[in-house]
Regions:
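Short alpha-helical interaction motifs and adjacent low-complexity tails used for partner binding
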Residues: 1-259
């Protein structure tokens, strides 16, 4: 479907899964749902961001800024008190036993794990191993794919997720909207001890799809793929909302489809 960035949440299918997860975690609490959704859509194109803000009346439900930390703690406590394990098993059962068109059930488990890491919630070692086993089973493309065949990961998003698993620590939040190396998936916190800082690709002119690299080796290693995405935004992209919102169908066009 529509993809405006290379990383995990730069894709309308990922947003759709995150909506389901947010509803399941919030359990009918509108403020918790709005808080979770605001984190997920922060890097979306304006049209996509605006669609969800209006569709779910997010601006009316989000509390003042000082409430964010306490809301994070509340959600993590819910997840750590059994809800995280319960939902993991629920989604995993659907992945194993249901009809899995475009690996959607598998992708849901990945997005749920990203949400868990986003709140620093507990993930069991057996669950982490299942996630590692699941990643290679999902479609992964390094470059532009026609929208209706564009499911699963982009390469940088896959590496971003695997790096997050490698550096996972219970109680420590991991943002999937911060820059990450497109070559190895690491974020600044992962490479700080090595004296490195992420560098933005000088050739990228597409703000939401700009590539970042932790060193020249990662940049050179990915160049055969990245050169096709580097440069100015090309054409128009389309995000298809299907049944993710309250409406049955929605379409938003945005600048730059060379991702």
């Amino acid at each position: 479907m529509g993809r405006w960035g290379h990383c995990l949440f730069g894709h309308d299918d990922a947003i759709g899964h995150a909506i389901k997860v947010s509803k399941d975690v919030a359990q009918g609490d509108d403020r918790q749902f709005a808080h979770m959704m605001s984190r997920v859509i922060v890097g979306c194109p304006p049209g996509v961001f605006g669609f969800y803000v209006e569709e779910y009346s997010l601006a009316e439900k989000i509390g003042p800024g000082e409430m964010e930390a306490s809301m994070d703690q509340l959600i993590r406590h819910k997840l750590d008190s059994g809800l995280g394990d319960e939902l993991f098993e629920k989604y995993r059962a659907a992945e194993q036993h249901g009809f899995d068109f475009d690996d959607m059930s598998k992708y849901l488990v990945i997005i749920f794990a990203a949400v868990l890491m986003g709140y620093g919630a507990k993930i069991k070692e057996s669950q982490i191993q299942h996630l590692r086993d699941l990643v290679p089973k999902l479609q992964c493309n390094e470059g532009v794919v026609p929208p209706f065949g564009d499911s699963g990961f982009r390469g940088p998003g896959k590496r971003q997720f695997l790096a997050a698993l490698d550096h996972y620590q219970a109680g420590k939040r991991r943002s999937f909207t911060q820059p990450s190396c497109h070559g190895c998936g690491k974020v600044n916190g992962d490479i700080k001890a090595e004296g490195k800082t992420l560098m933005k690709c000088g050739g990228c002119k597409n703000e939401r799809a700009t590539a970042w690299f932790c060193d020249k080796d990662c940049q050179k290693g990915l160049w055969k793929h990245h050169k096709h995405n580097c440069g100015a935004p090309l054409g128009r992209g389309i995000a298809l909302f299907r049944s993710f919102g309250k409406n049955s169908f929605g379409v938003i066009a945005y600048d730059g489809a060379n991702v």
